Amino acid sequence: MPRSLKKGPFIDLHLLKKVEKAVESGDKKPIR
């Protein structure tokens, strides 16, 4: 869920990398 645009998006770098990997592999598992 995105935060308010005023505050800007909050995504941890390690979490972002996990998301990118999941998207690349088409993985549908929940990302922890």
Swiss-Prot record:
The keyword Electron transport does not apply. GO terms for cellular component: ribonucleoprotein complex; ribosome. The keyword Cell division does not apply. Keywords: Ribonucleoprotein, Ribosomal protein, RNA-binding, rRNA-binding. InterPro entries: Ribosomal_uS19_SF (IPR023575). One of its GO terms (molecular function) is structural constituent of ribosome. GO terms for biological process: translation. Belongs to the universal ribosomal protein uS19 family. Protein S19 forms a complex with S13 that binds strongly to the 16S ribosomal RNA. This is Small ribosomal subunit protein uS19. It comes from Yersinia enterocolitica. The gene is rpsS.
